[in-house]
A protein has these predicted regions:
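Single conserved hydrophobic/aromatic residue that forms the stacking wall/gate
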Residues: 1-4, 8
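Transmembrane beta-strand segments that form the barrel wall of outer-membrane beta-barrel proteins
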Residues: 9-13, 258-270
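Residue-level signature of outer-membrane beta-barrel architecture
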Residues: 32, 36-37, 113-117, 183-185, ...
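Short glycine/threonine-rich loop-to-helix capping motif typified by GTGT followed
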Residues: 272-275
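Active-site and adjacent substrate-binding regions of carbohydrate-active enzymes
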Residues: 120
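Surface-exposed loop/interface segments of Gram-negative outer-membrane beta-barrel transport/assembly proteins
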Residues: 17-23, 29, 33-108, 124-242, ...
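Structured alpha-helical segments in the cores of large, soluble enzyme domains
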Residues: 242-252
Length: 275
């Protein structure tokens, strides 16, 4: 006996929240599930999911921008007599100040076995794996204001007056294992159930970043086009948790109830002698 399902989704979640500049969020998913009765006492369930998220916005569209616009008055002019955007409206920053982009891929797989060797006795073994790949790029382009003579003046909007590029990539692996068993039995007016199991989770992540300033041309805001202040670095971290648990349930005539729980957990967050 088998059952399966699959679906594909593509959604343009947010095609812009601002009138100046461009911001957009796109999301794509692909899901599949399959289940099979391997035997009268064994079942297999498997699922896979892929998710892609693409996000783009002006690099100036941060908390500082929203903080500033909350202090503007409805009477503030939008353009000057020469037809240029007024500096206080921060429109040039949104339109010409650079772009922030983020691309995120997640691939998840889950596998579960269910065994029933005896009536009332179940054994479960579950495993999950999630792979995440993320790429973030940001470029900052200086902008200009114009004086009364319509002459351009370089403006520092809080991020300097030189071109800047930042690139960050990271990969994260997540693993989870759950193995547990339960047994329930009734005799007369007595009903009981016992549950025992263990849980293990682990994260591994590494990243690499680089930055630079002074682009050869603002039309190609890439790291390879920066000429000064070139920097790079990387990082790695991991953490893990493990737990053991048990539960005993008893009731008499479905009226008098008793439940006992036991759990022991450990985490790599703490020093070895205190985990």
């Amino acid at each position: 006996d088998r059952d399966w399902s699959s679906d594909v989704c593509s959604s343009d979640l947010q095609n812009g929240l601002i009138s100046h500049g461009h911001d957009e969020l796109d999301r794509y998913t692909l899901n599949s599930k399959i289940g099979a009765e391997l035997a009268s006492w064994a079942r297999l369930d498997y699922s896979t999911k892929w998710t892609r998220k693409d996000y783009e916005k002006p690099q100036y569209l941060t908390g500082l921008f929203f903080h500033n616009i909350a202090r503007r008055w409805p009477s503030c002019p939008v353009v000057d007599p020469n037809g240029n955007w007024m500096a206080e409206m921060e429109i040039y920053e949104l339109e010409d100040g650079g772009i922030y982009k983020e691309n995120n891929d997640e691939f998840t797989q889950q596998l579960k076995f269910t065994f029933t060797p005896l009536k009332g006795w179940n054994i479960y073994a579950e495993g999950a794996l999630r792979l995440t790949n993320n790429k973030t790029t940001q470029n900052k382009i200086p902008i200009y204001n114009y004086n009364v003579a319509n002459e351009p003046m370089l403006r520092d909007s809080g991020y300097g007056t030189v071109t800047y590029v930042y690139d960050n990539r990271y990969k994260q692996n997540y693993y989870a294992v759950n193995v547990y068993t339960d047994y329930s039995h009734s005799f007369g007016k007595h009903n009981g159930k016992v549950l025992l199991g263990l849980n293990y989770e682990r994260y591994n992540q590494d990243n690499m970043w680089a930055s630079g300033t002074d682009l050869t041309t603002e039309d190609k805001p890439f790291l390879s086009q920066t000429q000064s202040n070139k920097k790079n670095g990387d990082g790695y971290w991991n953490r893990a948790t493990a737990g053991y648990f048990g539960r005993f349930n008893y009731n008499y005539m479905s009226k008098y109830l008793l439940e006992m729980n036991l759990r022991y957990d450990g985490s790599s967050k703490f020093r070895p002698e205190n985990r």
